[in-house]
């Protein structure tokens, strides 16, 4: 969570004096639940990718498992944007200036980026002897979350210096997201910034050191667009009006998300193509809109589950995982892909790999509970729905 100093309220904060949901409000548990869902989908993707072998790797089961693996990164980025909006609104209520808010957000993003670089270093050291040195500079999801938070901090700083209405903040965040998506096909092809060293260009289009953009990396274009979409939605949800109409906004957003999916598919089927190179699965703005629609639909379903369904019943493993998502992301990689993998790689049936997945899930849940206890946030853990915007991953 972003941590901001407590100062006396400033005059320009009067329009934000209405309370923002507190970190203790169980209404926000759905955000952590959704982040926990991203963790579980990530676990299954990595476990089956690492451990399935033989005919199992050619099965439809494996294909759908890896298709599900396209969801966690957009989910994490989308939720990071919502988290930043929460903290910005709360900081405005406390009277923070645009500069203070911007600096704190940029600093938190820089911390996540530093952790991403440290993670790459750890992976390189553990894999010493067979990993290429260029892996140190790979643009992975942690790097992109950090960069995205920094960019959101810059944007909030700039906008708040001139306009402080929620509508302005949400509209500009959404416009930035659409601009990132619209520029992605060009920056991956005809507008590539080839003048930059590849470690820097890779943050723009994921070129790495391979000469062409790589779809398995997470460059700013288009991935940061999901964070700004989350930021836009967060500003609406955490506004005074949004809090009063929370259920209606989320559910209408889910319906709008489904409509957006169909609209984007219709748009993509038009014969006119405005980009010189068409790549639906990696840079198409239409595919970006489809995934945004899917995120909105998932958010609505998760909200309903946590407010009116079993997700609101006492202890939730997904909420727990969502509160420590950075930790379980970091640790599970070593037990799935690393030298201390709990199963032999590419050597198991679906049943064997599923047993390994269950082991990873339970182990990461236990680790999460231990971390929560040690941090003093779990008294008691069972029966408690602590929400929010705990970590940006």
Where are these regions (language model features)?
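Alpha-helical transmembrane segments and their immediate juxtamembrane cytosolic regions
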Residues: 2-5, 12-393
């Amino acid at each position: 969570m972003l941590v901001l100093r407590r100062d006396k309220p400033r005059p320009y904060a009067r329009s934000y004096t209405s309370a923002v949901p507190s970190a203790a409000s169980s209404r926000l548990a759905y955000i952590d639940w959704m982040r926990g869902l991203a963790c579980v989908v990530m676990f299954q993707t990595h476990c089956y990718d690492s451990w399935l072998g033989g005919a199992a790797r050619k099965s439809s089961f494996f294909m759908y498992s890896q298709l599900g693996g396209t969801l966690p990164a957009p989910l994490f980025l989308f939720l990071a944007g919502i988290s930043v909006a929460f903290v910005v609104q709360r900081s405005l209520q406390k009277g923070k200036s645009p500069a203070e808010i911007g600096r704190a957000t940029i600093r938190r993003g820089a911390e996540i980026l530093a952790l991403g670089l440290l993670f790459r270093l750890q992976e390189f050291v553990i894999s010493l002897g067979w990993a290429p040195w260029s892996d140190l500079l790979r643009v992975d999801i942690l790097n992109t979350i950090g960069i995205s938070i920094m960019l959101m901090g810059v944007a909030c700083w700039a906008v708040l210096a001139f306009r402080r209405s929620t509508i302005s903040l949400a509209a500009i965040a959404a416009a930035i997201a659409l601009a990132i998506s619209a520029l992605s096909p060009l920056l991956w092809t005809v507008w590539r910034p080839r003048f930059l060293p590849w470690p820097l260009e890779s943050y723009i289009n994921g070129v790495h050191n391979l000469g062409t953009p790589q779809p398995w990396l997470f460059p700013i274009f288009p991935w940061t667009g999901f964070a700004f979409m989350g930021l836009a939605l967060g500003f609406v949800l955490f506004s005074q009006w949004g809090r009063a109409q929370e259920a209606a906004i989320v559910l209408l957003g889910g319906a709008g998300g489904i409509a957006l999916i169909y609209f984007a598919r219709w748009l993509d089927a038009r014969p006119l193509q405005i980009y010189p190179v068409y790549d639906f699965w990696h840079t198409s703005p239409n595919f970006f809109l489809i995934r945004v629609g899917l995120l909105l639909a998932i958010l609505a379903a998760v909200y309903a589950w946590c407010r009116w369904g079993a997700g609101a019943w006492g202890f939730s493993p997904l909420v727990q995982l969502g509160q420590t998502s950075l930790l379980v992301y970091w640790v599970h990689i070593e037990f799935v892909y690393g030298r201390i993998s709990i199963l032999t790689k590419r050597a198991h049936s679906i049943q064997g790999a599923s047993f390994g997945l269950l082991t990873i899930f339970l182990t990461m849940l236990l680790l999460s509970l231990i971390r929560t206890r040690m941090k003093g946030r779990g008294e008691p853990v069972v029966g408690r729905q602590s929400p929010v915007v705990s970590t940006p991953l």
